[in-house]
Swiss-Prot record:
Disulfide bonds: none annotated. Keywords: Ribonucleoprotein, Ribosomal protein, RNA-binding, rRNA-binding. SMART domains: Ribosomal_L14. GO terms for biological process: translation. Belongs to the universal ribosomal protein uL14 family. One of its GO terms (cellular component) is cytosolic large ribosomal subunit. GO terms for molecular function: large ribosomal subunit rRNA binding; structural constituent of ribosome. SUPFAM superfamilies: Ribosomal protein L14 (SSF50193). This is Large ribosomal subunit protein uL14. Part of the 50S ribosomal subunit. Forms a cluster with proteins L3 and L19. In the 70S ribosome, L14 and L19 interact and together make contacts with the 16S rRNA in bridges B5 and B8. Binds to 23S rRNA. Forms part of two intersubunit bridges in the 70S ribosome. HAMAP family: Ribosomal_uL14 (MF_01367). Pfam families: Ribosomal_L14 (PF00238).
Length: 122
Protein backbone atom coordinates (compact mmCIF):
# COMPACT_ATOMS: atom_id res chain seq x y z
CA UNK A 1 0.00 0.00 0.00
CA UNK A 2 1.93 3.00 -1.32
CA UNK A 3 0.63 6.50 -0.70
CA UNK A 4 1.86 10.07 -1.06
CA UNK A 5 5.27 10.63 0.62
CA UNK A 6 6.03 6.87 0.69
CA UNK A 7 9.66 6.00 0.00
CA UNK A 8 10.50 3.07 -2.27
CA UNK A 9 13.67 1.30 -3.31
CA UNK A 10 14.42 1.22 -7.04
CA UNK A 11 14.66 -2.29 -8.52
CA UNK A 12 16.50 -1.42 -11.75
CA UNK A 13 19.83 -0.02 -12.97
CA UNK A 14 18.54 3.39 -14.09
CA UNK A 15 20.80 5.11 -11.56
CA UNK A 16 18.18 5.96 -8.92
CA UNK A 17 18.36 4.25 -5.53
CA UNK A 18 15.36 5.67 -3.67
CA UNK A 19 12.08 7.31 -4.73
CA UNK A 20 9.59 9.51 -2.88
CA UNK A 21 6.00 9.19 -4.09
CA UNK A 22 4.40 12.43 -5.27
CA UNK A 23 1.11 11.12 -6.68
CA UNK A 24 -0.72 7.87 -7.34
CA UNK A 25 -2.04 7.85 -10.91
CA UNK A 26 -5.49 6.56 -11.89
CA UNK A 27 -8.47 8.49 -10.58
CA UNK A 28 -8.96 11.92 -9.06
CA UNK A 29 -8.92 11.06 -5.36
CA UNK A 30 -6.94 7.85 -5.39
CA UNK A 31 -4.96 7.35 -2.18
CA UNK A 32 -3.12 4.04 -2.46
CA UNK A 33 -1.03 2.23 -5.06
CA UNK A 34 -0.59 -1.53 -5.10
CA UNK A 35 1.51 -3.93 -7.20
CA UNK A 36 1.23 -3.02 -10.88
CA UNK A 37 0.06 0.58 -10.30
CA UNK A 38 1.86 3.61 -11.74
CA UNK A 39 3.06 6.44 -9.50
CA UNK A 40 4.76 9.79 -10.05
CA UNK A 41 7.85 10.10 -7.86
CA UNK A 42 10.98 12.14 -7.33
CA UNK A 43 14.48 10.68 -7.05
CA UNK A 44 15.83 11.09 -3.51
CA UNK A 45 19.07 9.12 -3.88
CA UNK A 46 20.97 8.38 -7.08
CA UNK A 47 24.25 6.79 -8.09
CA UNK A 48 26.78 8.88 -10.03
CA UNK A 49 26.68 8.46 -13.80
CA UNK A 50 23.15 7.07 -13.92
CA UNK A 51 20.41 7.83 -16.42
CA UNK A 52 18.33 9.68 -13.82
CA UNK A 53 19.65 12.27 -11.37
CA UNK A 54 18.65 13.31 -7.87
CA UNK A 55 15.62 15.60 -8.00
CA UNK A 56 14.25 14.23 -11.29
CA UNK A 57 10.49 13.65 -11.43
CA UNK A 58 9.81 10.22 -12.94
CA UNK A 59 7.02 7.71 -13.46
CA UNK A 60 7.43 4.30 -11.86
CA UNK A 61 5.50 1.06 -11.52
CA UNK A 62 5.25 -0.64 -8.11
CA UNK A 63 6.72 -4.17 -8.28
CA UNK A 64 6.98 -5.16 -4.57
CA UNK A 65 5.00 -4.07 -1.49
CA UNK A 66 5.17 -5.04 2.16
CA UNK A 67 1.38 -5.09 2.39
CA UNK A 68 1.24 -7.56 -0.48
CA UNK A 69 -1.56 -8.55 -2.83
CA UNK A 70 -4.40 -11.05 -2.68
CA UNK A 71 -4.52 -13.64 -5.45
CA UNK A 72 -7.76 -15.00 -7.00
CA UNK A 73 -7.15 -18.39 -5.36
CA UNK A 74 -7.17 -16.75 -1.91
CA UNK A 75 -3.41 -16.76 -1.30
CA UNK A 76 -1.37 -13.66 -0.51
CA UNK A 77 2.02 -12.55 -1.80
CA UNK A 78 4.09 -10.23 0.44
CA UNK A 79 7.63 -8.89 0.14
CA UNK A 80 10.20 -7.55 2.61
CA UNK A 81 10.39 -4.10 1.01
CA UNK A 82 8.53 -1.61 -1.14
CA UNK A 83 10.16 -1.33 -4.56
CA UNK A 84 9.43 0.21 -7.95
CA UNK A 85 10.85 0.24 -11.49
CA UNK A 86 11.24 3.56 -13.31
CA UNK A 87 9.38 3.55 -16.63
CA UNK A 88 9.07 5.71 -19.74
CA UNK A 89 5.74 7.05 -21.02
CA UNK A 90 5.26 3.92 -23.18
CA UNK A 91 5.47 1.66 -20.06
CA UNK A 92 8.93 0.31 -20.96
CA UNK A 93 11.62 0.38 -18.24
CA UNK A 94 14.30 3.11 -18.28
CA UNK A 95 16.97 0.68 -17.09
CA UNK A 96 18.21 -2.48 -18.78
CA UNK A 97 18.20 -4.80 -15.75
CA UNK A 98 15.70 -5.60 -12.99
CA UNK A 99 16.90 -6.62 -9.52
CA UNK A 100 15.00 -8.96 -7.22
CA UNK A 101 11.74 -10.84 -7.70
CA UNK A 102 8.58 -9.25 -9.08
CA UNK A 103 4.95 -10.26 -8.62
CA UNK A 104 2.95 -12.14 -11.25
CA UNK A 105 0.33 -9.35 -11.12
CA UNK A 106 2.56 -7.25 -13.42
CA UNK A 107 1.69 -9.62 -16.26
CA UNK A 108 -1.98 -8.64 -15.90
CA UNK A 109 -1.05 -4.93 -16.04
CA UNK A 110 0.77 -5.38 -19.40
CA UNK A 111 4.31 -4.79 -18.09
CA UNK A 112 5.67 -7.74 -20.06
CA UNK A 113 9.13 -6.18 -20.59
CA UNK A 114 9.63 -5.89 -16.82
CA UNK A 115 8.41 -9.46 -16.29
CA UNK A 116 10.80 -10.79 -18.95
CA UNK A 117 13.81 -8.90 -17.50
CA UNK A 118 13.13 -9.97 -13.90
CA UNK A 119 15.27 -12.81 -12.52
CA UNK A 120 12.26 -14.33 -10.70
CA UNK A 121 8.49 -13.96 -11.00
CA UNK A 122 6.51 -14.98 -7.91
Amino acid sequence: MIQQESRLKVADNSGARELLTIKVLGGSGRKYAYIGDIIVATVKQATPGGVVKKGDVVKAVVVRTKSGARRPDGSYIKFDENAAVIIKDDKSPRGTRIFGPVARELRDSNFMKIVSLAPEVL
